[in-house]
UniProtKB/Swiss-Prot annotation:
GO terms for cellular component: membrane. It comes from Aquifex aeolicus (strain VF5). It is found in: Membrane. This is Uncharacterized protein aq_1466. It is a single-pass membrane protein.
């Protein structure tokens, strides 16, 4: 019985040491986070056939908080500014811009300017 108890205690110590070492490794490798400003074209999702969509402004400024390790990563190119237009009828609308990040914890969007864009929906003439 004493031997099993010693093994359990030893296992607990090993697990605690593993968790602590992983935590320290994580902080060292991903801990420092820095602000980064980027510009992205606004992407349109949900276009309906037979309609033209005009977006103004066409670009937005995005502020990210990025882990130092990802500052020069190709993943930054995958940060996107998206508007969803599938429910819009003809006319001019004010639409909120969503920012999508491939790794939201390491490449975290914190601001987008402007937060709203104007979208004009025009039915195509045939």
């Amino acid at each position: 019985m004493g031997l099993n108890m010693a093994r359990k205690e030893n296992l607990v110590h090993v697990l605690v040491a593993l968790i602590l070492s992983l935590s320290i490794w994580f902080v060292v490798n991903f801990g420092e986070r820095l602000p980064l400003d980027i510009v992205r074209f606004v992407e349109i999702q949900g276009k309906r056939e037979g309609y033209v969509y005009r977006v103004e402004p066409q670009t937005v400024d995005i502020t990210l908080i990025v882990s130092r390790r990802f500052l020069e990563s190709k993943l930054l190119e995958r940060v996107r500014a998206i508007i969803y237009v599938f429910e819009l009828k003809e006319g001019t609308h004010r639409v909120r811009v969503d920012v999508v990040s491939p790794l939201p914890y390491f490449i975290q969007p914190v601001a987008v300017n402007p937060y709203y864009v104007n979208v004009t929906v025009i039915k195509e003439k045939r």
